Regions:
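Peripheral docking tails and interdomain loops at the edges
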Residues: 2, 329-370
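Short, charged, surface-exposed secondary-structure boundary motifs
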Residues: 58-67, 126-131, 260-267, 353-355
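C-terminal hydrophobic structural anchor segments
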Residues: 292-339
Length: 370
């Protein structure tokens, strides 16, 4: 089991090495910006989709294009592009899922001209038939742009890729369930399991995760720690996860955009694969960047916390992330109504001092032990 966890850690910690490995094999890389992109299309057209969620880097050149109040995930993505960290990629796909993402694409065209920008425009009202048609039209634009880079599209290939991705989704949902029963898997290791998926082909990642599930299910769990549900856009900061482990907190479920939110919804496996993929987006819910008038995400967090016997909810708020800030008020009220302890910590990609986070989580730990 440790061998698998080490492989996943290496992939999560060394995305450039992963990228260079695929390039050395003659494969073409297409970067996928947060939060959701049609990876199945990219995969079906012969490219390797690779996540581009920024990194823990100082912002210098990105400030020439972005005001200070834009979220650091997107700003650091642009900074890495300018610095050459993504050199070798054939393109980047950036969705229109928040105000910051809507603006960064145009900046990317001028700041990183060596890596073509491919927009994917999603509708707010994604569930009606006209919303599905709009999503499909956006995907057709992506297909045309990828064809210019040498990719070829067919419904048959897309169906094959949908099956690959659905199997990976199932493995990730299953490992989430299994991890809830194994407190000995640390927050850092859990982060590696999910983060590594952005930097490996889905076939390779699925194979490792399925073996990990088998080994965990055959293993007796360790003594219980403090079970919590964690929520946010991104929770991969090593210092944050180290503090969670130090506080003996066990993540029994997550509502994290870069983790379980990616894998909740499968595309129907049908011959009209492009329509099916558009329907997948229509069927997605419970995310701050997806419009739902009644905000079912709030109930999902409370219900999941109860189902997994969590003692509390930790919201990790990415600084200047408007969609998450808007939802937090409703999440807080729902947790209070359910008598479910909740705390919030604010993070960004440039944080180097986590003393305030530590103090907050120490207090939260003491509260959960009462």
């Amino acid at each position: 089991m440790n061998e698998i966890l080490n492989k996943l850690h290496e992939a999560a910690a060394s995305p450039r090495a992963q990228m260079d490995g695929y390039l050395a094999q003659g494969k073409k890389i297409v970067l996928c910006a947060p939060v959701y992109t049609p990876e199945e299309i990219i995969h079906a057209m012969g490219f390797v989709p690779m996540g581009a969620w920024g990194g823990d880097v100082a912002l210098n050149r990105a400030k020439e294009y972005c005001p200070a109040f834009l979220c650091a995930i997107v700003q650091s993505m642009l900074e890495l592009g300018i610095n050459g960290a993504y050199d070798g990629a054939s393109a980047i796909v950036i969705p229109s899922l928040c105000d910051t993402l809507k603006t960064v694409g145009e900046n990317w065209k001028y700041a990183v001209p060596s890596i073509p920008f491919i927009p994917v425009t999603y509708p707010q009202n994604r569930k009606p038939a006209y919303g599905v048609a709009y999503t499909k039209a956006g995907y057709e634009r992506v297909i045309r742009d990828l064809e210019k880079l040498g990719g070829t599209f067919s419904e048959e290939k897309l169906l094959d890729s949908i099956k690959v991705y659905n199997r990976h989704n199932a493995a990730m949902r299953k490992v989430d369930e299994v991890l809830a029963k194994h407190p000995e898997i640390t927050a850092a290791q859990r982060s590696d399991i999910f983060k590594s998926a952005f930097f490996m082909t889905k076939e390779e990642h699925t194979a490792l995760v399925e073996v990990l599930i088998e080994k965990l299910e055959a293993k007796n769990p360790a003594a219980e720690k403090l079970p919590i549900v964690i929520s946010g856009i991104l929770t991969d900061a090593p210092a944050l996860n180290a503090i969670l482990d130090e506080m003996d907190m066990h993540i029994v479920a997550d509502d994290v955009a870069a983790q379980s939110r990616q894998y909740r919804t499968d595309a129907p496996e049908r011959a009209d694969a492009l329509n099916a993929l558009a329907e997948k987006f229509a069927n997605m819910d419970n995310c701050s960047v997806l419009y739902n008038q009644d905000k079912p995400r709030v109930k999902w967090i409370v219900d999941t916390a109860k189902a997994r016997n969590a003692k509390g909810v930790l919201v990790v708020l990415t600084k200047f992330c408007d969609p998450e800030e808007f939802d937090y008020v409703m999440i807080k009220k729902a947790c209070e109504a359910a008598d479910l302890p909740l705390t919030l910590v604010e993070v960004d990609r440039q944080m180097v001092r986590f003393e305030q986070v530590r103090t907050n989580l120490e207090t939260f730990r003491d509260l959960l032990k009462m």
